[in-house]
């Protein structure tokens, strides 16, 4: 090996949809020091095409073909398996592993769990929708609610996007749902959405089972209702380590602060025109004038009591590069303001709650257009 040329194709839809226009990068590298190999970092290139505009569209997964051509020191093609090029195909999802997990803990389809979140207890605000990410690539997944509820009370369905609005035409909660992947990249991550939760029995369970032997153990999720009569519950939405959108409710007190920035200059206050030619000035005029004023608001929120397993959920929230806050009527982008957090343990703290500060990801005065 002397040089290796990489042609990287990235696209959405079904795998067969790949076109010549989907070639996003062509890169050539030479071996160094007779190592007889070269290395390409694909993930950073692919991430450029992972795009989310909340309430509009999202690209949670992509098809990727890495086509490699090898040449020797005479610039002649080195065939591999009788072929001039070799193609490696990937389904790319914008997740991550921890250092202690080793290299790429999601290297095969069956190492990705059916439930694309770590917590198997979901605390939800009474009457608000429940949204749970499910992996649909590896096998057909069946979702079952227990105890059963009449279809006029609770509805549920699957959606390709997290923010899909509910509908009264959806399946009743007394019927099972099948999570099926048709091969489209948009359906690899699906969201199980439950509406009408005011009629859902507290601590109902949602069971995910699969027809694939690689998922021999069912996943049981407990749905715990929280009724908060005093404060307005806030939902924090974020991308978790599996590359799926997830939300966590903060039920208790929240406070909002604003930080103002501006420039100042000394104003010329002398007035000849309105004082009969005698130099004068108005006492109501600003000698020190402020301009280019704007503000950034921040919010500090409190979760209420959670079980210790939510330490991992909060960790992923704090590590997320895209976070939003939902107050029951609108969704706005936010960035983490608290850069440190002490994780709590029930053996030490008895009751576990979280207080986190975020900054709204925009200036208060619109200066875009």
Report the location of each language-model feature.
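Preference for solvent-exposed, low-hydrophobicity sequence contexts
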Residues: 1-227
């Amino acid at each position: 090996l002397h040089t290796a040329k990489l042609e990287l194709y990235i696209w959405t839809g079904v795998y067969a949809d790949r076109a010549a226009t989907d070639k996003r990068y062509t890169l050539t590298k030479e071996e160094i020091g007779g190592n007889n190999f070269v290395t390409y970092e694909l993930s950073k290139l692919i991430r450029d095409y992972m795009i989310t505009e909340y309430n509009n569209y999202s690209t949670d997964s992509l098809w990727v073909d890495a086509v490699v051509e090898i040449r020797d020191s005479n610039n002649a093609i080195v065939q591999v398996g009788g072929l001039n090029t070799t193609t490696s195909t990937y389904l790319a999802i914008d997740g991550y592993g921890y250092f202690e997990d080793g290299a790429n803990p999601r290297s095969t389809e069956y190492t990705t769990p059916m439930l694309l979140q770590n917590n198997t207890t979901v605390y939800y605000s009474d009457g608000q929708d429940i949204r749970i990410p499910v992996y649909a690539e590896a096998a057909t997944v069946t979702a079952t609610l227990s105890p059963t509820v009449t279809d006029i009370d609770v509805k549920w369905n699957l959606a390709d996007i997290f923010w899909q609005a509910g509908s009264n035409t959806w399946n009743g909660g007394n019927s099972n749902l099948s999570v099926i992947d048709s091969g489209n990249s948009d359906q690899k991550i699906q969201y199980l959405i439950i509406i009408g939760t005011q009629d859902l029995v507290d601590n109902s369970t949602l069971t995910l089972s699969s027809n694939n032997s690689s998922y021999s153990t069912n996943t049981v999720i407990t749905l715990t209702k929280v009724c908060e009569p005093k404060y307005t519950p806030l939902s924090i939405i974020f991308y978790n380590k599996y590359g799926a959108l997830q939300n966590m409710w903060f039920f208790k007190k929240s406070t909002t602060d604003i930080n103002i920035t501006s420039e100042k200059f000394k104003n010329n206050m002398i007035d000849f025109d309105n004082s009969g030619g005698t130099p004068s000035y108005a006492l109501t005029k600003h000698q020190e004038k402020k301009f280019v004023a704007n503000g950034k608001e921040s919010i500090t929120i409190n979760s209420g009591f959670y079980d210790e397993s939510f330490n991992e959920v909060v960790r992923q929230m704090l590590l997320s590069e895209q976070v939003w806050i939902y107050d029951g009527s609108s969704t706005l982008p936010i960035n983490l303001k608290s850069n440190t957090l002490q994780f709590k343990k029930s053996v030490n703290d008895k009751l576990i709650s979280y207080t986190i500060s975020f900054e709204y990801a925009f200036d208060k005065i619109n200066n875009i257009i």
